Amino acid sequence: MNPNQKLFALSGVAIALSVLNLLIGISNVGLNVSLHLKGAGTKQEENLTCTTITQNNTTVVENTYVNNTTIITKEPEFRAPSYLLLNKSLCNVEGWVVVAKDNAIRFGESEQIIVTREPYVSCDPSGCKMYALHQGTTIRNKHSNGTIHDRTAFRGLISTHLGTPPTVSNSDFICVGWSSTSCHDGIGRMTICVQGNNDNATATVYYNRRLTTTIKTWARNILRTQESECVCHNGTCAVVMTDGSASSQAYTKVMYFHKGLVIKEEPLKGSAKHIEECSCYGHNQKITCVCRDNWQGANRPIIEIDMTTLEHTSRYVCTGVLTDTSRPGDKPSGDCSNPITGSPGAPGVKGFGFLNGDNTWLGRTISPRSRSGFEMLKIPNAGTDPNSKIVERQEIVDNNNWSGYSGSFIDYWDDGNECYNPCFYVELIRGRPEEAKYVWWTSNSLIALCGSPFPVGSGSFPDGAQIQYFS
């Protein structure tokens, strides 16, 4: 074959390949157009799937090399909001790791940090936030004098990104009040704030930031609620509220809400003698609340709510390992039905536990007399066995540093787990009354921890502020 014939042959092959490449490109364009027309012709209001087609055509005539690549990728489906269903069990936990620490008091030495107390954590489909009751002032403001008082007209609920100390510029105002709870049902958030006079208080209920109803005091003695997140199942949210004496008989109700409206309420049933400041978590279509008996018990009362029947019962954590503060020494055997008394006893502190059979964990201050230090105790079957004992201990805050309230929370929208990973927070109170020598204010920082399925190391995570810097 002479050179001219070779040239014609190569040119013919190149032209053929180019035509083939052109036909493939035309077919890809046709496919793309047909897919888009099909998507446009079908109206889907909830679940939409986007298809992206990337075409790369390369032709080199001289070397007769053709590269034709078509990549079809599916973007993740958009899921319409739906009600949370408590259809998982709690995850097993081998130890606890810190996931957030806001260092609010340390920042407050030079920054305009808001004075708060009663903080907690609550999650929704987009993530988790810190909620707290502010005192209408910043730490360095002269109005911080006297913020040891729990109930004033200047308090209100705010939220910030978890781990971010609250300032005037980054805090989101929620509602006015000196007691609160908040939870997300998967579609919207319900929030309750209690405001007004001690003997004539009102609870205001909001759903998606809009006022939906109000609840007036029923015992005229400091109507109050959980000071941590409530929990929802299939659109119904359960909240524990108490009205009455903090040191004798009080009147507790379990209330059920749908979109911020009361659909049912039950007076306290079961053997618990006094209920305050419940820390609640959901699992297996149930809600378990570990609460505070401010009247008699150094053991914690619990409320168990069946969210399929909207009914509850109450009793006490069975173990003889006592977790309220103040408390007497641990007992060889506990009591599932009655408060365990002893000196020192009342008044108490908000606390929590995760009652999960062999993987039960309870939290408590290290000091039996004051709100200092914090530890997590693994006590298998503590919720059901009076003779259950501590098998593992993890220190969270050493006993040379102040702690405070603590409570539970769970990110129910963590799709990476086939179970609900337990989490909790600890309030780190600074100022009065323990540090009245240095300052006139009372405020807090916060740490949040979540369970690890693997063994963890050790560490103490105190507030860390040098209080004398504020003198």
From Swiss-Prot:
Ca(2+) binds at residues 293, 297, 324. This is Neuraminidase. Catalyzes the removal of terminal sialic acid residues from viral and cellular glycoconjugates. Cleaves off the terminal sialic acids on the glycosylated HA during virus budding to facilitate virus release. Additionally helps virus spread through the circulation by further removing sialic acids from the cell surface. These cleavages prevent self-aggregation and ensure the efficient spread of the progeny virus from cell to cell. Otherwise, infection would be limited to one round of replication. The gene is NA. One of its GO terms (biological process) is carbohydrate metabolic process. One of its GO terms (cellular component) is host cell plasma membrane. It comes from Influenza A virus (strain A/Chicken/Victoria/1/1985 H7N7). Its main location: virion. It is a single-pass type II membrane protein. Inhibited by the neuraminidase inhibitors zanamivir (Relenza) and oseltamivir (Tamiflu). These drugs interfere with the release of progeny virus from infected cells and are effective against all influenza strains. Resistance to neuraminidase inhibitors is quite rare. GO terms for molecular function: exo-alpha-sialidase activity; metal ion binding.
